[in-house]
Amino acid sequence: MNLPIKNLVPDEQLIKEVQYNCDISDARDHGIYSMCSLVLKLRNLYKWEKGLQPWSEPEAAELLDWIEARESYWEEIAQQEFRPLTLNGRTCPVDDVNAVNGNNGARPYIYGAGHGRSMKAIFFLAEVVDHLSMEDCPVLLLGREHAREMASPLAMVQEGQVLVRTEPLRYFLYDHIQELRSSCRSSYRYFLSSYGLLAGGELDQQKLSAVLDQIAVNERHLFIYHEIGELLEDSLDSETQRRLIGRFPGSVIEFVSRAVRDVLAD
């Protein structure tokens, strides 16, 4: 990655424990995705695991072998419980983010835990590269990720802070720019042209790899302000929505409630 990321590595045992819980989450709930979405998420998980850039495409046979092995692994662990986390010789529950991160946020990494679509468990462990304040809300910019699961939301609110995950954001932007190139919408073409990505009407792939990090820096405020909106929105608070989704996961009720809250936040 070309962004200025410090080498701030968490304890190896903690990394393994968080990643194991990520794997269990994927094993339990990968069925919430369509086949197409699942393959795309697995492809990016493979790239992350192998340290590949978003534009580096694996050999199809190698990727399929990896997916087959991953599905077999999921069958082995799907019924396992999440593993407590070990920190300084003591254990703590997987949802105790304050115990892992420290109440003063002094550690150079952050542990994220929560729930996403259809109450899929979200875990990750990432290095903190910068602290910002926007609209009086604390914002943490995250860099290298040492553990992650398949969903990998680009940004989230945790303990009153907005967390922005640079690695998933880079994969997301790259994939969506590939989709934009076939669109004839003038707004999409304007976006691509503003970064000099159109050459003779076609997407300049080489230029994209060179400017992807800058695009991530320039566009991340869109995700930050959305999360700030969710943090400040109180007509449909996060706890009410969490209970609603927990009662009706994967339903029209969940999707409508998420859409309403997104609109209110924006």
Where are these regions (language model features)?
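Post-HEXXH active-site segment of zinc metalloproteases
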Residues: L3, N218, L231-R261
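Metalloprotease/metallohydrolase-associated module, dominated by Zn2+-dependent proteases
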Residues: E159, E167-R170, V252-D266
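Short alpha-helix carrying the canonical HExxH Zn2+-binding catalytic motif
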Residues: A216-G229
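Active-site scaffold of zinc-dependent metalloenzymes
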Residues: M150-N218
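N-terminal low-structure segments adjacent to metalloprotease catalytic domains
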Residues: M1-D136
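Short linear interaction motifs
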Residues: A126-S152, L203-Q206
